[in-house]
Amino acid sequence: FLDFAFGSHGSFAVLGWVGTRIYQEKPPVPEKVVTQSGQLVYTKLDIQEGQNIWQAMGGMQIGSVWGHGSYVAPDWTADWLHKEILGTQNLLAKQFYQKTFDELTDSEKSSIKSKVTKIFKTNRYDVNTGVITIEDFRYEAIKLNVIHYSDVFLNGRDEYAIPKNTLIDPEKIRKFNAFIFWGSWAASTNRLDEDVTYTNNWPHEDLIDNKPTADTVVWTGVSIIILLLGIGLMALWYATQKGQVEHKDFPSDDP
């Protein structure tokens, strides 16, 4: 479950390769997500029903997940991740320095960034219990994201082609957020015993050093070459066939 069909955007070879990797080492859907203090954040059912809610809204016609979908609205994975990181940075800045992140010195910012990177990259999924455990302050950052997305789908966004009252049920909004959180978690969390995320460090996110792997870079180059070669071969075929195609005269009247 939670498999995504690849769209027609971007490089098909890269998407196919990344998709294969995700399928082979796909991120676990946890039984539940809890805080270190034991507070329940999301359940497996929340995540699964959240995907259904996203699909019922239009799915890949309304933004994308892991890069698969339309680009009118944001990629929800990348958007959620970026906002959650910013929220976590500010929460830690206030905890350690009693200032907002923007008010910190360069060395203080570097310290906070290092802490946040470790928080997001560290895999806290327990394979025995199926539970993901997150820090209490990270849950506070998640709550900030929930407020933002509630506003997006209740009040609409013209720039995203999302009309007002797209989602009005608070429970549906909560479950949609559960699904997007899970997608973001998979995109930022390293696989167990590996130094690469479940989505091969996609999306690119400098705030936690989520950068393309060497394999991704190589396949990007290969896919571009294949794409250009394919276009060239099609153009050559068309040029050689021109004048050889039999053109039939069409009747003047519709029979």
Where are these predicted regions, by residue range?
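Post-cleavage N-terminal segment of exported redox proteins
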Residues: 1-42
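Hydrophobic alpha-helical transmembrane segments of multi-pass integral membrane proteins
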Residues: 2-5, 210-226, 250-255
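Selective detector of the "anchor" transmembrane alpha-helix that sits immediately C-terminal
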Residues: 10, 217-239
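Soluble extramembrane regions of membrane proteins in the secretory/endomembrane system
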Residues: 25-218
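Juxtamembrane interface at the cytosolic side of transmembrane helices
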Residues: 229-255
